[in-house]
Design a protein with these regions (language model features):
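Basic, Lys/Arg-enriched alpha-helical interface segments
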Residues: 1-67, 76-80, 88-114
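ATP-dependent carboxylate-activation loops
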Residues: 83
Length: 114
């Protein structure tokens, strides 16, 4: 399959999250990231806009009873920029994680315009 989106990491946050996971979880994350890179219309089950934010999305990963989220945004339409990730343990996404992602997104675009 031909890639229609490029996936990049901003700073080290995603890599630290990824490296801390089991091989099984890493495999599932890789599957979902591959899907996002090759499918034109990604199902909401895997990628959804974060309500109350401007341009912030969450990548959704489920493995058994474990739920993981990775925050990201789009840049120039075809580039997906990954920020922080975490294991979701409650129904509601922790505000601190959203704020961290918003801060990283702002830093990314500010740095890009320099």
């Amino acid at each position: 399959m031909e890639k229609i989106r490029q996936i990049i990491y901003y700073k080290h946050h995603f890599e630290e999250f990824f490296n801390g996971q089991t091989e099984k979880v890493k495999g599932k994350i890789d599957e979902v990231l591959f899907l996002i890179s090759v499918v034109e219309r990604v199902p909401k089950k895997f990628l959804d806009h974060m309500t109350g934010t401007t341009g912030l999305y969450e990548i959704r990963i489920e493995l058994g009873s474990n739920i993981f989220r990775i925050f990201c945004c789009f840049d120039e339409g075809r580039i997906v920029v990954l920020f922080n990730g975490f294991q979701k343990k409650t129904q509601k996404t922790p505000k601190a994680e959203i704020e961290k992602a918003e801060k990283l997104k702002a830093e990314y675009f500010k740095q890009k315009t320099k």
